[in-house]
Amino acid sequence: MEITEEEQIPPILQRVRCGVVEGFLTVFKMIKFVLPLYIVVDMCKAYGVIDSLGAWCAPLMSLFGLPGATAFAFIAGALVNLYAAIAVLAPLDLTPWQVTQCGVMMGIAHNLVLEGGVLSSTGARGGVLTLFRILLAAIAGWLMLGMQALGVAG
């Protein structure tokens, strides 16, 4: 079977150019969202807002061995997306292990509103699955805290 001219794969240079352009467009979309959020969080940190509000959330976050300020990253990740969570986490003074722990927990439970709605629209029980994801993220956080306490990681 012979391949016609319309069915041919575009030349490699054209594919690379297209990929680079699409990559830059994606990066610029992310920067437009993440950079302002990062600046706001950094300003809130500089003026003590994060510390004050973080103290209020500290009891909950201490269950996972995390500072109270990380609660805002979890809220941003749950309500918006992971890019918002990263923008909130970036200016915080976290250890590499704490960043990993937050990443695992948020990887399990992120964008809950939108994804819960999508699940519900497919006939699944979106609310139940959303609660399950939150519970699973909490269990993962506790397990990682335990690993750190045992000296296995972190």
For each feature predicted by the language model, list its residue ranges:
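Hydrophobic alpha-helical interface/terminus motif in multipass membrane transporters
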Residues: 40, 44, 88-89, 118-119
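Membrane-embedded alpha-helical segments and adjacent helix-loop junctions characteristic
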Residues: 3-76, 153-154
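C-terminal transmembrane helix pair
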Residues: 87, 95-153
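Alpha-helical transmembrane spans of integral membrane proteins, capturing the lipid-embedded, hydrophobic core
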Residues: 30-38, 78, 130-138, 142
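Alpha-helical transmembrane segments of polytopic integral membrane proteins
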Residues: 33, 37-40, 50, 82-85, ...
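Membrane-interfacial helix-loop connectors
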Residues: 51-110
